[in-house]
Amino acid sequence: MNEAIIQLDHIDITFRQKKRVIEAVKDVTVHINQGDIYGIVGYSGAGKSTLVRVINLLQAPTNGKITVDGDVTFDQGKIQLSADALRQKRRDIGMIFQHFNLMAQKTAKENVAFALRHSSLSKTEKEHKVIELLELVGLSERADNYPAQLSGGQKQRVAIARALANDPKILISDEATSALDPKTTKQILALLQELNCKLGLTIVMITHEMQIVKDICNRVAVMQNGVLIEEGSVLDIFSNPKEALTQEFITTATGIDEALEKINQQDIVKHLPANALLAQLKYAGTSTDEPLLNSIYRQFEVTANILYGNIEILDHIPVGDMIVVLEGQAENILAAEKALHEAGVDVSILKRGA
């Protein structure tokens, strides 16, 4: 089991503006393990970016304790490292942002080299390092191009290479794909996953999009109004969300809310027979391998009309979501529901026949 590389314990962040007191983060505890791709999700103003800025002490908390890679960096209201030690700790943490922050008058390789200006490497070693980094992010052929000659995705690749220049153990991505189109977003996420595997890089993803969490993260924390309201593995959160906001994020990411709107307009649902019901089935892991609907027909003579179906792979585990009309004798439907529950399927009744 991997050890925690980032420990944020009981973090409070309060801002004072004249007579106003703004509690941006309230008593948040988050532990992120070495090698995690950890998502922190929430709407604008949730406090997620403010929270993550305390990892490298770009933002000092009001209260709480911060431990990064075994070193306590903040405790008892003050920074625990010397100025030199803090600078070194910050070199272990790379950051990428929504806006690429590249220098327009410098080429791609010069932008990456800029991050090495305080490195102890020789000039030749720096040149080799820059070439290696651009190859790592798949941009070696664009080394001599200026930012104006690059697409949004290519600019973000340069920014990632620059963030990796000092061999960080942690990479923080603050809405880094928000300005990109869907295809480019997928390419950047695939690159981050590759870097996570190849370098053992711990990645912290700040986002307002649960789709990104679903695509890349293994754990997720959900924030609302400065409070951490839910945290766990992506599989657990997606298959069994407890908070209303989490459920809202997930229905948006899976598209099931749009599917339900269309399903409710279908005649079969509008005029549901007395011996039928509309149900949502959620299942994970080995349950996705079983022909369960076929089984309940054979055992209980309950038919299932599939109106919507979707299977996602979350952290290498299949998770399914299905909306069906179950039809049969009332006692048989009850028996079928019980059998589905026993097989590990969560059954939610959306509508009963009149």
Swiss-Prot record:
InterPro entries linked: AAA+_ATPase, ABC_transporter-like_ATP-bd, ABC_transporter-like_CS, ACT-like_dom_sf, MetN_ABC, MetN_ABC_transporter-like, NIL_domain, P-loop_NTPase
Annotated protein name in UniProt: Methionine import ATP-binding protein MetN
Cellular compartments per GO CC: plasma membrane
Assigned keywords, A-Z: Amino-acid transport, ATP-binding, Cell membrane, Membrane, Nucleotide-binding, Translocase, Transport
SMART domains on file: AAA, NIL
Subunit details: The complex is composed of two ATP-binding proteins (MetN), two transmembrane proteins (MetI) and a solute-binding protein (MetQ).
Known role: Part of the ABC transporter complex MetNIQ involved in methionine import. Responsible for energy coupling to the transport system.
Keyword Zinc-finger part of the UniProt annotation: no
Cell compartment(s), UniProt: Cell membrane
Membrane topology, from the record: Peripheral membrane protein
Annotated family: Belongs to the ABC transporter superfamily. Methionine importer (TC 3.A.1.24) family.
Major site of localization recorded for this protein: membrane
Transmembrane segments: none
Gene3D superfamilies, A to Z: 3.30.70.260, P-loop containing nucleotide triphosphate hydrolases (3.40.50.300)
Residue stretches making up the ABC transporter domain: 8-250
Enzyme Commission number(s) of this protein: 7.4.2.11
Pfam families, sorted: ABC_tran (PF00005), NIL (PF09383)
Reaction catalysis annotation: L-methionine(out) + ATP + H2O = L-methionine(in) + ADP + phosphate + H(+); D-methionine(out) + ATP + H2O = D-methionine(in) + ADP + phosphate + H(+)
Binding positions for ATP per the UniProt entry: 42-49
GO MF annotations, alphabetized: ABC-type D-methionine transporter activity; ATP binding; ATP hydrolysis activity
